[in-house]
């Protein structure tokens, strides 16, 4: 019995010395904090394509391929080393004008991007998905963002805030947008349920926009009823559906919104050929009541970002100007 007791005590003593701590406190260190076997990551992010991106440390060399995301970065006080060229529909924030120009959003110079040695690149899922493998091969993190709806816009801002360690600032900005949109919605006639259609014109075609487009989402928040909702979307363009004058006549929208992309003279020619030149168009309620509105590209073609409340308010003012005096 004594030998057994002595043996047991020796085992406990050896175990205590080996681990350097009490058996019931094996996960604490000298500072009385849990011991960490691996370094904690700076941030774990799930992007718009549901890809999980782990950032080991705060990014210091960020390249942005998406013009609209520049405003998100600027809003949270972030910095960049590379950005796309400016265009009529996308203005570069003053604080980012000196960043390296990596080419147009549809024609990114990937050699220049890799040469900048970034530790993170923001990309657009639609245009830049093909670059992910190249970036990862060069040990460059890629985060895809493609915000069109308001909820996607807020989520993109949250992600941008996490990247720059400014999560609280991002939440404040989202709250401010929520408040502005709520104020606009409060001025709308109660349960008006006006029927609308959103035509999207380019020099080559006319389509209609669904609720998951920028204009469609803004219209939905304002209580408009999109006559195209429920229509099968065009393959590869989930926010658009085919245009049909027959459906337009059948549904007879009370309001017509028009978004466009391209040279104005060519767009007007296309609208006249496909829409306005048809005698049935003149008989539509929206046309007879002069309720046809052209929506600006800077708010409804490229994602408006933090200007989403402006897009919603503009649409509301177009239709109900008397409510915003």
Where are these regions (language model features)?
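Alpha-helical, coiled-coil/dimerization segments enriched in small aliphatic residues
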Residues: 87-90, 208-239
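Structural recognition of the beta-strand scaffold that forms the well-ordered cores
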Residues: 61-65, 81-84, 120-124, 142-145, ...
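Flexible loop/hinge segments that line or gate small-molecule binding clefts
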Residues: 92-95, 127-163, 293
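Short helix-initiation/N-cap motifs at beta->coil->alpha
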Residues: 48-50, 100-111, 233-245
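A short, structured surface patch at a secondary-structure boundary
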Residues: 66-116, 120-125, 227
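Extracytoplasmic ligand-binding site segments that recognize negatively charged/polar headgroups
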Residues: 130, 146-159, 193, 197-218, ...
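Structured C-terminal subdomain patch of bacterial secreted/periplasmic proteins
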Residues: 154-155, 162, 171, 182-185, ...
């Amino acid at each position: 019995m004594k030998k057994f007791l002595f043996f047991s005590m020796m085992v406990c003593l050896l175990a205590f010395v080996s681990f350097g701590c009490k058996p019931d406190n094996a996960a604490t260190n000298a500072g009385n904090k849990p011991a960490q076997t691996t370094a904690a990551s700076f941030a774990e992010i799930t992007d718009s394509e549901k890809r999980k991106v782990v950032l080991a440390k705060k990014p210091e060399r960020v390249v942005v391929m998406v013009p609209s995301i520049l405003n998100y970065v600027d809003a949270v006080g972030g910095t960049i080393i590379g950005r796309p060229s400016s265009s009529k529909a996308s203005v570069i924030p003053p604080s980012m004008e000196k960043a390296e120009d990596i080419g147009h959003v549809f024609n990114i110079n990937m050699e220049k991007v890799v040469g900048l040695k970034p530790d993170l690149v923001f990309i657009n899922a639609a245009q830049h998905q093909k670059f992910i493998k190249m970036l990862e091969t060069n040990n460059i993190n890629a985060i895809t963002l493609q915000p069109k709806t308001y909820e996607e816009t807020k989520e993109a801002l949250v992600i941008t805030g996490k990247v720059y360690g400014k999560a609280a600032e991002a939440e404040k900005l989202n709250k401010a947008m929520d408040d502005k949109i709520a104020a606009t919605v409060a001025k709308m006639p109660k349960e008006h349920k006006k029927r609308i259609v959103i035509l999207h014109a380019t020099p080559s075609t006319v389509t209609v926009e669904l609720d998951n487009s920028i204009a469609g989402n803004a219209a939905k928040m304002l209580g408009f009823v999109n006559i195209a909702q429920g229509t099968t979307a065009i393959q590869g363009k989930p926010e658009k559906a085919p245009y049909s004058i027959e459906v337009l006549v059948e549904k007879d929208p009370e309001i017509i919104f028009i978004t466009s992309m391209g040279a104005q003279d060519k767009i007007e020619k296309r609208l006249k050929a496909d829409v306005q030149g048809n005698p049935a168009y003149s008989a539509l309620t929206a046309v007879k009541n002069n309720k046809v509105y052209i929506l600006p590209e800077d708010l409804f073609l490229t994602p408006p970002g933090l200007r989403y409340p402006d897009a919603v308010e503009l649409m509301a003012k177009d239709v109900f100007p008397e409510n915003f005096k």
